[in-house]
């Protein structure tokens, strides 16, 4: 076997596993929505597709992917099922854990590079300082993917040692109780349940500062961490919007409604709406990936991303999330009475597309903060970088 072919074989195998995973997901997505979480057996399937080694440091056996490659994969998953795309997006969260002490990371990856992490970061709750670290007692929300996670994280406020940036404590699943409270209109299958921790002492070396300095020197961990966390969520919305557009095109030639009106595709306003939605989604998506590539090139050149580049990543992400949600809403508006039924595909897609836009990383405050940075002013929201 030639060296070139040998090098290509893992990528080919990974792509085959990825396609197999997508085919299984198309069959099981209703199951996940009904049970309100992605089960552990499918998390194992995501692992075989390489999702949970995409942000594991190479020094620990990982295959860290350029951000654009990982984002494209999450978008493709989300076009099949937004909830699974959302859970899979946290395969990128291991960039956070690169701020753990090096020896702690060596323990974390001792059994292999495929580690599924789920965090419940809000509301941040202070731990009681101990000689070894912190004693935690509290309840945290939105632990997406916690049912299938190998390790969990809970949020703590910033302190003097973290320069005010929030901390995360890393826990084994048996150290937390999962409370399955999750009754929502969008991303129902994410299993974004609550975590309850009672009197658990976490060693200091098993905590890290979110967005803190990484202890691993590889290119991915020099890419803006918080911006990347926003990007992986925004691109879920893009995948959902793509599914909605594909549905609109597919049914447009067949649905005529009960009044005898022309088929949707024969109505000028429907064609206009679909065309505008296509243009808007692809334009927002193009800028999103353009900004991603520019920052990655900067990182690969050995230079730090500038504040302006970070702001553009945050802005492009918020814009993509908003555009994706608007696209689905517009398609519902022009699709007649069919989408009012709870079983209509656009109903689920509308709820799924709404969730990224509502996330704190992608909400209205991001536009203000990005605008400030673009005009040479300090960011107006904490944790912008």
Language-model segment annotations:
Residues 239, 275-282, 314, 318-325, ...:
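Generic structural signal for well-ordered, non-transmembrane alpha-helical segments
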Residues 185-187, 192-282:
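Glycine-rich beta->alpha junctions and the first turn(s) of the following alpha-helix
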Residues 38-48, 52-149:
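Glycine-rich flavin
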Residues 26, 30-33, 283-319, 329-340:
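C-terminal helix-coil-helix/basic helical segment that borders enzyme active sites and/or dimer interfaces
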Residues 326-333, 364-368:
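Short segments within alpha-helical structural elements
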Residues 1-23, 384-385:
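Basic/polar N-terminal segments that are highly enriched at the extreme N-terminus
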Residues 337-385:
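Glycine-rich phosphate/cofactor-binding loops in nucleotide/flavin-utilizing enzymes
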Residues 139-176, 336:
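DPxDG-like acidic metal-binding loop motif
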């Amino acid at each position: 076997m030639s060296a070139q072919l040998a090098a290509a074989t893992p990528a080919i195998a990974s792509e085959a596993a990825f396609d197999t995973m997508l085919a299984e997901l198309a069959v099981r997505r209703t199951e996940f929505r009904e049970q309100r979480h992605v089960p552990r057996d499918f998390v194992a399937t995501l692992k075989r597709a390489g999702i949970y080694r995409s942000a594991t440091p190479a020094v620990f056996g990982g295959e860290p992917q350029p951000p654009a490659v990982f984002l494209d994969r999450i978008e493709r998953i989300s076009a099949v099922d937004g909830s699974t795309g959302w859970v899979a997006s946290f395969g990128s969260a291991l960039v956070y854990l690169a701020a753990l002490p090096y020896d702690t990371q060596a323990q974390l990856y001792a059994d292999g590079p495929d580690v599924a992490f789920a965090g419940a970061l809000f509301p941040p709750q202070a731990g009681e300082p101990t000689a070894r670290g912190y004693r935690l007692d509290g309840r945290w929300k939105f632990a997406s993917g916690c049912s299938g996670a190998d390790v969990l994280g809970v949020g703590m406020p910033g302190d003097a040692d973290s320069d005010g940036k929030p901390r995360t404590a890393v826990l084994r699943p048996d150290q937390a109780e999962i409370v399955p409270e999750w009754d929502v209109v969008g991303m129902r299958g994410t299993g974004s349940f609550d975590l309850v921790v009672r009197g658990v002492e976490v060693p200091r070396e098993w905590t890290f500062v979110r967005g803190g300095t990484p202890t691993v020197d590889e290119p991915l961990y020099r890419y803006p961490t918080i911006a990347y966390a926003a990007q992986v969520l925004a691109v879920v919305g893009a995948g959902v919007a793509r599914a909605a557009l594909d549905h609109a095109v597919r049914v447009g030639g067949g649905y005529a409604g009960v009044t005898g009106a022309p088929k949707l595709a024969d109505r000028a306003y429907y064609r206009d709406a679909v065309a505008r939605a296509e243009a808007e989604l692809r334009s927002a998506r193009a800028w999103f990936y353009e900004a991603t590539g520019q920052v990655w090139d900067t990182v690969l050149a050995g230079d730090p991303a500038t504040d302006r580049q970070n702001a553009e990543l945050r802005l492009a992400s918020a814009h993509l999330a908003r555009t994706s949600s608007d696209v689905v809403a517009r398609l519902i508006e022009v699709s007649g009475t069919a989408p009012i039924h709870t079983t209509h595909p656009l109903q689920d897609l509308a709820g799924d597309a709404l969730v990224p836009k509502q996330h704190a990383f992608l909400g209205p405050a991001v536009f203000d903060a990005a605008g400030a940075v673009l005009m040479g002013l300090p960011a107006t929201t904490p944790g912008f970088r």
